[in-house]
Design a protein with these regions (language model features):
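Basic, often amphipathic N-terminal segments
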Residues: 1-62, 82-141, 153-162
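A short, structured active-site edge motif that brings together acidic residues
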Residues: 65-71
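Charge-rich, low-complexity N-terminal segments
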Residues: 73-78, 107
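Short, exposed beta-strand-loop hairpins at the edges of beta-sheets
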Residues: 144-147
Length: 162
C-alpha cells in the first residue's frame, strides 16, 4: 500500500467558518479527514521520531487570520505571524531534504489555510465578514492518506519547546 503523508497545524476551531466551502470545493475535504490547517510539509516522511526531534524546538503561538488572498485556483486565509510557520517549515525542510514542499513545485512556500478551490465570490462573501479569525497553533499532526482511504492521524506533536 502506497501512502502519502502531510505534517499540518490543524485549526479545528475554524471548521464552522470554512468547512462547508472546503467540503464543496476542495480536493482534501473535511469528510475525508482533512481538518482546516496550515501545511508544514507535504509530502512528508512517516518518520515520527525525526519529526518530533524537529518540532520539539517550537512552542505554541497565537494566530490571527485577518485577510483572504489567492493563488491560481485557491482562495486562502493568511496566518499571522506567518514567520512562525515559515521557521517550522524551514526546519522540517532542512531535516528532510528528500521531501521538498509540494515536490518542489513552488519557488516560495507561503503559509496559508485553504478556504476554497472554486466558488470564490461566495467564499469571499461568506468568510470576509467574519474576519479577523483568532486561533492558536498548539500542535502539529502527521496525517496519512492511503489509496481510496481518508486522511488519518498517525501522530500528534504538541508545540511546547523545552
Amino acid at each position: 500500500m502506497n501512502a502519502t503523508h502531510a505534517i499540518v497545524v490543524p485549526f479545528e476551531g475554524l471548521a464552522s467558518v470554512v468547512d462547508d466551502l472546503r467540503e464543496r470545493t476542495c480536493v482534501s475535504k473535511p469528510s475525508h479527514g482533512m481538518p482546516p490547517h496550515v501545511t508544514l510539509l507535504y509530502p512528508a516522511p512517516r518518520d515520527v521520531e525525526a519529526i518530533a526531534e524537529v518540532l520539539v524546538a517550537f512552542s505554541a503561538f497565537e494566530v490571527v487570520f485577518a485577510r483572504l488572498d489567492r493563488f491560481p485556483g485557491t482562495l486562502w486565509l493568511a496566518p499571522e505571524p506567518a514567520e512562525r510557520f515559515q521557521r517550522v517549515i524551514e526546519a522540517l525542510v532542512r531535516r528532510f531534504p528528500d521531501h521538498p514542499p509540494y515536490d518542489g513545485a513552488f519557488a516560495e512556500i507561503v503559509p496559508h489555510l485553504t478556504v476554497a478551490q472554486s466558488a470564490f465570490d461566495e467564499a469571499v462573501v461568506s468568510v470576509e465578514m467574519r474576519l479577523p479569525l483568532r486561533s492558536r497553533a498548539e500542535r502539529a499532526v502527521l496525517l496519512e492518506h492511503a489509496e481510496a482511504e481518508h486522511w488519518r492521524e498517525v501522530a500528534s506533536f504538541e508545540l511546547e519547546a523545552v
